[in-house]
Amino acid sequence: MTNTSPQIEGFFDPATSTVSYLVLDPATRRCALIDSVLDYDPKSGRTSTASADRLLARVAALDARVEWLLETHVHADHLTAAPYLKEMLGGKIGIGQHIATVQQVFGKLFNTGDEVARDGSQFDHLFADGELFSIGALQCRALHTPGHTPACMSYVVSDGTYGAAFVGDTLFMPDYGTARCDFPGGDARTLFHSINKVLSLPEHTLLYMCHDYQPGGREVRYVSTVGEERTGNIHVRNGISEEEFVAMRTRRDASLEMPTLILPSVQVNMRAGHFPEPEANGIR
């Protein structure tokens, strides 16, 4: 591994099928944590930090310093552990600047009133499309890739050759396809264009997924390449038109159930991982 190559490690959470990532610059020991998970029991409403503590332990073992706590979007299927990790490790919580749109939409749905600022100010940094940033000496670029939600971002990390992209819920492994677009603010046509934006990267670019649902009961996989997605993705491989994709995605979305954790997840995640204020009886 050269000093310009990132060390990337994935951490799979079987309860939510979510993959969190640690991205380390070996030269400087600076790192980013992407799409962390705060464990949540929907029956009791209790949280735990078991998944996040795996990241804590690994950061300590690597003697690394956290610069970024990155969110690819406001997740609807798990709660972020970013505030906990920030308290323990430091770093800036970052998300796409269109988080304000998500807060506007869900602020109305959840009737948050003035309790939730709808300008993204809960986050430490709001990324613009194409914005350059760094993890240690690693050069990175934020790409706005909406469709699943209005605020979805992909983060591209250069390694001096083809690089790696953390694509959130834009794409899945080729045998599972693409993300749903039926949440408020989602749009299948927009997602098609965002996917093409990702697939315009060099064909050997590594793509790191936010989820793997193990179709057919196969083993967990969460890394593919641009080339593999172009030729093999069951929803958007070469030859599938925009109209065909939109029709397929619309039909499929109509058959899907809502995620188990959508109500707590969106309320917490649009607040950068902070819980809503307690009600008058002290219960959140």
Q: Predicted segment positions?
A:
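Conserved beta-strand hairpin/beta-sheet module of binuclear metal-dependent hydrolase folds
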Residues: 4-65, 155-168
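Conserved protein kinase catalytic core
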Residues: 31, 41, 79, 175, ...
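Active-site HxH/HxHxD metal-binding segment of metal-dependent hydrolases
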Residues: 38-139, 163, 231-232
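Active-site metal-binding loops of divalent metal-dependent hydrolases
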Residues: 36-38, 74, 98-99, 148-149, ...
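Accessory terminal helices/loops
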Residues: 2-7, 98, 186, 193-284
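Short Gly/Pro-enriched turn/cap motifs at secondary-structure boundaries
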Residues: 10-14, 116-117, 122-124, 144-148
